[in-house]
């Protein structure tokens, strides 16, 4: 993960009557996708969740799920778990994409929240301990120097608008740049600047 100079995190809306802005479907099942279990544990404890010993995921995968109910919501926190050979957290865009897809298939959530620590840039207004909602995400390390493929590689996408969260929680908003390297090479830095990013992570 990137150094904890900011956080790409959010909170569950307290009222069970929360409604999805996408299709006005009432929100009842929420999945948090969090790359590292140490990042997830504060929420696991906050929501008093239980680890799923009879996994809903395919046999043999290291993915970990914590589940329970909180104020009328079915809460799930899913982590990629530990690499079987090396014992480290399965960070990066590939493992997080797989576990997110599997969570959608198995849990049918109404809302998915990708949360965790990230690096932030002071020149863009980020400070240690800030909580950001991502307004847009893009890659900074998918370099394909062919017309049109270069745009595909950057993969810039706008995030869902969450005006109620912004208003109620008074969070900061910024563009997020993601990639599979913790360090920041000069070429990555140039791409991050081009992405106009305030926040940098490894799992967006």
Residue ranges and their predicted role:
Residues 2-159, 198:
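Metabolite-binding pocket within alpha/beta catalytic cores that recognizes anionic/polar moieties
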Residues 147-204:
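Active-site rim beta-loop-alpha module in soluble metabolic enzymes
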